[in-house]
A protein has these predicted regions:
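Feature captures outer-membrane beta-barrel proteins of Gram-negative bacteria and organelles
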Residues: 127-137, 162-175, 194-214, 236-246, ...
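Outer-membrane beta-barrel proteins
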Residues: 144, 154-156, 192-194, 219-223
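Transmembrane beta-strand segments that form the barrel wall of outer-membrane beta-barrel proteins
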Residues: 106-118, 143-150, 176-188, 209-217, ...
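Outer-membrane beta-barrel initiation region
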Residues: 1-169, 229-232
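Phosphate-interacting basic helix/loop segments used at nucleotide- and nucleic-acid interfaces
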Residues: 1, 179, 193
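Exposed, low-structure sequence patches enriched in small/polar residues
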Residues: 4-6, 124, 215-225, 231-253
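Composition- and surface-driven signal marking solvent-exposed, interaction-prone regions
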Residues: 22-25, 185, 196-198, 254
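Gly/Ser/Thr-rich loops at beta-strand to alpha-helix junctions
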Residues: 16-17, 188-191
Length: 254
């Protein structure tokens, strides 16, 4: 979208496993284009805006004139969680190209469990491979279907059986003023199934995050007698959380 002095673009990284690599490729492509003035790049995740990268016209012109390199552009560009102005500029933009909807990823998660809780054994262990199919649905919607394949363990019962992992449907939403929401239903980890709602707020610089979660879950397990057993008794859980990120030390405090 073109506004006086600024070109606004939204993009989603569907190619590179590293988000930073995808962002870098998008910035490089925009700087090599023939647009004039400043640039605004909205980073999307499953079509939900997450970040806005601002490159003023002085920065883009200095790069195109060979006065600074791409590394210096990264150091001087602005990054904010506030995407409201940029998304307003994109409201009447053309149809998106290569959307993420209905694209499927096959991901394999290695899983190692170690626990020392007995005197007659040094530890109990379990090594699993957890392949998962992850599909982006509509805007903010995602489906995950995972199976747990035991590789080696000295445990018994369910831990030796092929069993379902995370089988869930989630919906992300973004409200104005940096407020995010997520609703997830399905089969979770730690033998729990049910539903969970998350709400969080992030400051513009992304350092502070405040939020809360609430859910209702029941017991879920694979047993020899009942197959996939799903308990009816529900347990209500809720929590409040806060985190702070210190970029100079690359540390996050929860």
């Amino acid at each position: 979208a073109q506004t006086p002095g600024v070109t606004t673009v939204s993009f989603e990284n569907n190619v590179y496993r590293s988000t930073y690599t995808g962002v870098g490729k998008a910035i490089d492509a925009c700087l090599e284009s023939k647009t004039k003035g400043g640039l605004q790049l909205v980073v999307l995740e499953n079509r939900i805006p997450r970040l806005c990268i601002n490159l003023p016209d002085t920065l883009t012109e200095a790069y195109r004139n060979g006065e600074i390199n791409l590394t210096q552009v990264y150091q001087q560009m602005g990054i904010t969680v506030d995407t409201d102005p940029a998304m307003k500029a994109l409201k009447n933009a053309g149809q998106e190209e290569v959307p993420s909807a209905w694209k499927v990823d096959l991901v394999i998660y290695p899983d190692l469990f170690l626990e020392n809780n007995t005197f007659d054994e040094l530890y109990t262990y379990a090594i699993n491979l957890n392949p998962a199919v992850e599909m982006a649905l509509w805007k903010g919607g995602k489906m995950t279907a995972q199976v747990i394949l035991p590789v080696a363990t000295n445990l018994s019962g369910e831990m030796k059986r092929i069993r379902p992992g995370i089988i869930a449907l989630s919906q992300d939403v973004r409200f104005r003023h940096n407020i995010f929401g997520k609703m997830t239903v399905g089969n979770f980890t730690n033998n729990r199934y049910g539903a969970q709602l998350e709400i969080k707020y992030r400051t513009n610089n992304g350092r502070w995050e405040l939020g809360g979660t609430a859910g209702s879950t029941g017991f879920s397990a694979i047993t020899r007698e009942d197959g996939w057993y799903i308990g009816r008794k529900q347990r209500i859980n809720a929590s409040l959380n806060a985190s702070y990120y210190e970029p100079r030390l690359n540390l996050q405090f929860d």
